């Protein structure tokens, strides 16, 4: 191995356990969607599982990361789903690829709009009446201190996320009813963040003199310091949202 690996330990690109993923797939396929749209899909693991559970459905994944999309295409081929899914390397802003019966937007609302209310309005536009939206969105368990914010991501601010009650309220204001509200556990966060860095940490231990080692080490150390700071402070909500139909 001569270059740092990327995300090979991750099944999902977020704090999502296998049991929760199974529950989400079961809930999101209850209304038998025939079209699925995945915003900021990455390698689209959750969408592929939904397609496998709903043989009549087709899916579209949108992302700007070519490497992640290639991983998604390989996974689709391995599962015999190639003819039912397409992966598009493009921006999701103003996307014409809707409406869909099921819209997934997990950790990717910023791909639709800069502010959460506008992103929620876009999700309402992109989902069919009687469809579902799965929104995976960050929230604060408590307001972080200035010292904590300084150790998180660059220019982190207490206004970067709402609290959970405010988040759900924004979804209601955008024309949804919350069918189900759940949040990632601390175990899910620790599994995700550890898997996110695991291969890189092993590579750094085995290649300390590599030309890329210094910058890779600095990046890994910065990310670890950030997540150990927002651990227990930053949450991720999984909201299953039902659009309110026009009267």
Residue ranges of model-derived segments:
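Conserved Class I S-adenosyl-L-methionine
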Residues: 182-247
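Conserved class I S-adenosyl-L-methionine
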Residues: 33-42
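A short glycine-rich, Lys/Arg-flanked "PGG" loop and its adjoining helix->strand segment in the class I
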Residues: 117-132
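A short SAM/SAH-binding and catalytic strip from SAM-dependent methyltransferases
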Residues: 101-115
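A short acidic, Gly/Pro-enriched loop at the edge of an enzyme's catalytic core
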Residues: 93-103
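Conserved alpha-helix/loop element of class I SAM-dependent methyltransferases that forms part
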Residues: 14-32
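Class I SAM-dependent methyltransferase SAM/SAH-binding core
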Residues: 45-93
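Short, glycine-/aromatic-enriched active-site segment of Class I SAM-dependent methyltransferases
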Residues: 138-158
């Amino acid at each position: 191995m001569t270059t740092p690996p990327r995300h090979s330990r991750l099944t999902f690109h977020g704090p999502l356990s296998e049991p929760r993923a199974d529950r989400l797939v079961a809930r999101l396929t209850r209304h038998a969607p025939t079209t699925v749209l995945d915003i900021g899909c990455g390698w689209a693991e959750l969408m592929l599982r939904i397609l496998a559970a709903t043989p009549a459905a087709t899916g579209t994944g949108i992302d700007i990361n070519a490497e992640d999309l290639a991983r998604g295409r390989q996974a689709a081929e391995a599962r015999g789903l190639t003819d039912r899914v397409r992966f598009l390397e493009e921006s999701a802003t103003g996307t014409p690829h809707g409406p869909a019966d099921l819209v997934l937007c997990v950790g990717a609302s910023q791909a639709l709009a800069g502010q959460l209310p506008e992103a929620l309005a876009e999700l309402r536009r992109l989902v069919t009446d009687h469809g579902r939206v799965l929104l995976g969105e960050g929230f604060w368990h408590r307001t972080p201190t200035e010292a904590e914010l300084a150790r998180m991501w660059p220019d982190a601010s207490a206004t970067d996320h709402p609290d959970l009650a405010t988040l759900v309220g924004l979804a209601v204001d955008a024309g949804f009813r919350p069918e189900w509200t759940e949040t990632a556990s601390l175990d899910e966060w620790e599994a995700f963040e550890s898997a996110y860095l695991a291969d890189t940490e092993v590579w750094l231990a085995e290649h300390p003199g590599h030309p890329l080692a210094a910058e890779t080490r600095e990046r890994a150390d910065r990310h670890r310091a950030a997540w150990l700071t927002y651990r227990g402070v930053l949450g991720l909500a999984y909201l299953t949202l039902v659009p309110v139909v026009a009267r």
